[in-house]
Swiss-Prot record:
InterPro entries: RepA2 (IPR019661). This is Replication regulatory protein repA2. Pfam families: RepB-RCR_reg (PF10723). It comes from Escherichia coli O157:H7. It comes from the Bacteria. Residues 1-13 have a biased composition (Polar residues). This protein is involved in the determination of copy number in gene replication. It binds to the repA promoter thus inhibiting the synthesis of the mRNA for the initiator protein repA. Residues 1-31 are annotated as: Disordered. GO terms for biological process: plasmid maintenance. Keywords: DNA-binding, Plasmid, Plasmid copy control, Repressor, Transcription, Transcription regulation. The gene is repA2.
Length: 84
């Protein structure tokens, strides 16, 4: 069979069925991601003055870290100062 015939026949066939079951919706993916995080980490919700939030975001940007990573480093640093 020539390549042109092969190309025509392969593209005209039905698409292969998804083999791993039904794909998850974006909401389901997000829910599973949060569940995995909750298994290992504790959630902290805080309200900051806008100037402190801007400082936090600046630190994150400069260091290339997430907010969680910056806050963890700050807490560790303060804990060492206090001998906790």
């Amino acid at each position: 069979m020539s390549q042109t015939e092969n190309a025509v026949t392969s593209s005209s066939g039905a698409k292969r069925a998804y083999r791993k079951g039904n794909p998850l919706s974006d909401a389901e993916k997000q829910r599973l991601s949060v569940a995995r995080k909750r298994a290992s980490f504790k959630e902290v919700k805080v309200f900051l003055e806008p100037k402190y939030k801007a400082m936090l975001m600046q630190m994150c940007h400069e260091d290339g870290l997430t907010q969680a990573e910056v806050l963890t480093a700050l807490i560790k640093s303060e804990a060492q100062k206090r001998c906790v």
